[in-house]
UniProtKB/Swiss-Prot annotation:
Keyword line: Chaperone, Cytoplasm, Stress response
This protein's encoding gene: grpE
Annotated protein name in UniProt: Protein GrpE
Gene Ontology CC entries for this record: cytosol
Keyword ATP-binding among record annotations: no
Compartments (UniProt record): Cytoplasm
Function as written in the Swiss-Prot or TrEMBL entry: Participates actively in the response to hyperosmotic and heat shock by preventing the aggregation of stress-denatured proteins, in association with DnaK and GrpE. It is the nucleotide exchange factor for DnaK and may function as a thermosensor. Unfolded proteins bind initially to DnaJ; upon interaction with the DnaJ-bound protein, DnaK hydrolyzes its bound ATP, resulting in the formation of a stable complex. GrpE releases ADP from DnaK; ATP binding to DnaK triggers the release of the substrate protein, thus completing the reaction cycle.
Main location: cytoplasm
CDD domains the UniProt entry points to: GrpE (cd00446)
Length: 189
């Protein structure tokens, strides 16, 4: 009986390492599976957070680019406004030079004063043109976008509504009217 018990014990002793080994392998397998699941969860969590951060980055970058463009546009508009304001301030000076030239030319077209005023006016108009400021043409056709009719006169030479005389030169800045030309137009009854 003792032998039987010893044999059974030996038999169990031999099975015990196999059982432990099998139990350890099962436990390791379960731990690996749990670790894999945790790793998968961590990876999913990381990918989700990465995606969120990337989307935030893209939004912030787009906002930054929009602000940058808006600032450039505002800067450009401020510069345009400054040029326009300077041009408006120069118009009375140009008018005075034109008046002086007209008076000097009536007295003596060949005088040094007349020639000097002509050269000054030419240079001034060149500078203004370089910066987008130019005189409004006053041909025969009256255009309310560019001309301001301040009086009507009888004219045998001009048709009704045509420009007879330019009383004050008009100017535009990059196509936009700074000051309309003051003109008289024909009115024939």
């Amino acid at each position: 009986m003792k032998d039987e018990h010893n044999q059974e014990h030996d038999h169990l002793s031999q099975k015990e390492p196999e059982f432990c080994e099998k139990a350890c392998k099962e436990q390791q397998y379960e731990e690996k599976q749990e670790a894999g699941e945790k790793e998968g969860e961590i990876k999913e969590d990381f990918e989700l957070k990465y995606k969120e951060m990337h989307e935030k980055y893209l939004r912030v970058h787009a906002d930054f680019e929009n602000v940058k463009k808006r600032l450039e546009r505002d800067k450009s508009m401020a510069l345009e406004y400054a040029y326009e304001k300077i041009a408006l301030d120069l118009l009375p000076v140009i008018d005075a030079l034109l008046g002086a030239h007209k008076s000097a030319a009536e007295e003596d077209k060949e005088s040094a004063l007349t020639k000097g005023l002509e050269l000054t006016m030419e240079k001034l108009h060149e500078v203004l043109a370089r910066h987008g400021i130019e005189g409004i043409e006053c041909l025969e056709e009256f255009d309310p976008h560019f001309h301001n009719a301040i009086m009507q006169v009888k004219s045998e030479e001009k048709e009704n509504g045509k420009i007879v005389q330019v009383l004050q030169q008009g100017y535009k800045y990059k196509g936009r009217v700074l000051r309309p030309a003051m003109v008289s137009i024909a009115k024939n009854d």
